[in-house]
Amino acid sequence: YAAIMDAYQNRQDATITFEQLGVDRLYVDEAHFYKNLSFTTKIQGLNATGAEKSTDLLAKIQYLNEITNERGVIFATGTPISNSMAELYTMQRYLRPSRLESQGLYHFDAWASTFGQETTTMEIDPAGKGFRAKTRFARFNNIPELTSMFKEFADVKTAESLKLPVPAYDIEIVKADASAVQKELVDRLAERAKRIRQRNPIKLREGADPSSGKGMDNMLVVIKEGQSAALNPRILDADYEDNPTGKVSLCADNVYDIYQKTTVQKSTQVIFCDQSTPNSKAQYNVYDDLREKLMERGVPKEQIAFIHDYDTPEKKERLFAKVRKGDVRILLGSSDKLGVGTNIQNKLIASH
């Protein structure tokens, strides 16, 4: 507090450092949000590019580890490993770096050569038109030793050991046949992917620079457009005709069917969609389209809500209270905004 007041009074040096705050404990909930920590590797198939927030967290943790002998940071997460085996290395790097250093495993490739194994499998290529051999870091070695190192800093609780009350559920996969437009788009994307592999990509806009790659086609763009086309081609071009048997229409049919069957008990449903979110400048988005389709089928507008419209904790809690009571019966949101800290399960009957 004294450091803050001194800095406030001396406007010429108003910057407060993390050390000056006097922090000696750091609790990080949902710690998997900081899994993208950069590292150097020669292994293919790994995302070694870090996020700025993870680098910032590492700097703070390194300071706390130094002053607390690696006892000042507590992580809480249900998914310490979600997408990549390298995330386990990241957790060790955050919480037990001294152990990595003492074993000569602080650099990722040394850790990977001890605990990991590369495997080669056939998988569908990004364009979705063929297969290719892909080598990935996908299997653990020396598991007893790795487990022992992990348990030095991890207190692991499973759902079975906690005896969490998890309701029974059924999974239904809804199949949507590709439309003629979607098939045509996939063919175009496959051709673009082929040109990219041949180092002859198309220009995405006027003034594109082939030498620097700016404005030129790349696989990330192809994959993103492929995902959009698979959901609804209108994300790419709003002038495409609506498909009554497409994913959005089928979702509306299923949601309305459950809505009708559970009217008496006012059951609620949640719809997750990470693409084509509302409040964008695009002419078309899936959220507005789905709401319009539900309203056309008979769902009142006030019983449909977008989590994106509730941008403060207070607004979200008021929304969640309405969902728990069944006043709002259909809630749409993305995984980031609706997947964590959402207490709406009282009347929840289905998730789409």
Where in this protein do the model-derived segments appear?
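SF2 helicase motor core recognition
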Residues: 20, 35, 83-85, 317, ...
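Conserved ATPase-coupling elements of RecA-like P-loop NTPase cores
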Residues: 33-53, 85
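Conserved Walker A/P-loop ATP-binding site and its immediately adjacent core
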Residues: 80-87, 273-277
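Conserved Helicase C-terminal RecA-like lobe
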Residues: 164-338
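Inter-lobe coupling linker of SF2 helicases/translocases
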Residues: 2, 6-25, 53-83, 94-241, ...
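Walker B catalytic acidic pair
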Residues: 29-30
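Glycine-rich, phosphate-binding/catalytic loops in enzymes
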Residues: 42-47, 90-94, 287-293, 347-351
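Short glycine-/polar-rich loops that comprise or flank the Walker A/P-loop
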Residues: 22-23, 68-73, 87-90, 169-171, ...
